[in-house]
Every structure is written in C-alpha cells, then in structure tokens.
Amino acid sequence: MTARMEQRFADVAAEGRPVLVTYFMGGDPDFDTSLAIMKALQQAGADIIELGVPFSDPMADGPAIQLAGQRALKAGQTLAKTLELARRFRADDQRTPIVLMGYYNPIYIYGVERFLTDALEAGVDGMIVVDLPPEMDDELCIPALAKGISFIRLATPTTDDRRLPKVLENTSGFVYYVSMTGITGSALPDTSLIAGAVARIKAHTSLPVCVGFGVKTADHARAIGATADGVVVGTAIVNQIASSLTEEGRATEATVPGVEALVRGLAAGVRAARLAAAE
C-alpha cells in the first residue's frame, strides 16, 4: 500500500467511519471538465478517487460507463491524457489517493515499464485492471508493486474460499468487493449479505475491504458503510454527469456542481455510517 493510501485509510479509521471511493471516467465529457470534476470530488468529501481509463472494448462495464468511455474517446482522451489528469490534480492535492481503473490493452500498448514510470511520476497510488487475473501477475501486478504502486483486486460473491487466497496473494491497497455478480451499475446490492462477505474476506487478509456496484444514494452508502471499510460509488456519478450534458455530449454549467452535490450527499451517508454502526 502506498504511504498516501495507507495514511488516508488510517486517518478515516481514526474518525470511526468508512472511506468514500468515487469513480468517474477520465475525459468525460472533456479533459478540462474532468479535471474540474476531480477537484469537485475531493471538495465534496471523496476520500479516494478512482479515475477511469477509457477503452474501446470495456467488457465489465455497464451501459452508463460504456457511454462515458465512448464520450471520452470521442473527445480525444487517451491513457497519456488520463495520466496528465492525475498529474494536474496532484499539483494541487498531495493527500487524496488516485487509483486508475481500466483494462490491460491500453497499458500494454503504452508499454508497461513506461506506464509505471509515468504513473508514479503523475502521483498515481494504485490501479485496478479488471481483465488481468492473478495468474497473470507477472505482466503488471508484480512490476507495479516493485514500483510502489498498489494493485487492487476485485472479489465477488462467486469468489469462494479456495479461490480467495490466490486473488489476495499480491493484492495491495484495498480489496474491492463487488457486491453482486454481473456488470457495473446493476441492480441494488443485498446489504444483509454484505457483512458476512466482508467478514469472510477479512479472514484471509488485513487489507481494508471496500464495497461497491449498485451504490446510488446516501442511504445505500450509510447501510453498506456500517459493515465495510469503504464504499465505492461509480455509476451514480457517471449518470449524474451524463444527465447534465447537452444533446451533443458537451458539458454545461450544471455538470460540475451536479457531481459535487451528489457526492456531498454520499459523503454525508458514509459519515452517518459511523453513527449507525455505533447504535
């Protein structure tokens, strides 16, 4: 785990609450608006920012995030420009961890060693690469860890106790528990099952466990946050961005304020989780 991410989890744990992890697609709807969104996420209460890297074949993404990726690609977003987003944000914020989330193909084309060097220089703290299983750790995970960049793994309800140790073997930063099977932005999670799932994962690791997929409201964030170390919100933010755009997919005056308002509500939810868990 990077020092910045470790410090963030420690600081938030000292407050007695879960972290709020927010995802959006880098370059959606354009570079400058994305940078403003990153800053708004932090100002609204996001503890960790997941920065999506657009890809032309996003097999694990739901319709909303697929469309966001298409808008970003149309606007000219690339992996290099996504790293530049991180670099620009990091110039003004040295504390908020940044996690890149995407697919291996753009990294492979960019060049693994070059990518890791540039990501570290840009202030990236971790990555989630959804199409690289543990059996391919030598491709990117092990080199990333050697550079000091966390490699965050996904676990799902179908990750059984035989598979879980392999998934967690080289995981760093935190474990991202997908609270349902399927694609991102699916139906709401069954919060009654989440506590048991988090406990099962924690029996195998000391890493924080963050739960996502299906979190849309402050109430969802509060309910999940009462049993997890963190709450991940993505599709709701992407949908908020999309709803504010013109028919041509351009940003409006409502784009950034709309995201900030949504995330302020979600942040209030995770802070209320501390109170709910203590009752």
From Swiss-Prot:
Transmembrane segments: none annotated. The keyword Amino-acid biosynthesis applies. PROSITE patterns: TRP_SYNTHASE_ALPHA. It catalyses: (1S,2R)-1-C-(indol-3-yl)glycerol 3-phosphate + L-serine = D-glyceraldehyde 3-phosphate + L-tryptophan + H2O. It is an enzyme of class 4 (lyase). One of its GO terms (molecular function) is tryptophan synthase activity. It comes from Sinorhizobium medicae (strain WSM419) (Ensifer medicae). This is Tryptophan synthase alpha chain. SUPFAM superfamilies: Ribulose-phoshate binding barrel. NCBIfam families: trpA. The keyword Protease does not apply. The gene is trpA. Tetramer of two alpha and two beta chains. Disulfide bonds: none annotated. Pfam families: Trp_syntA (PF00290).
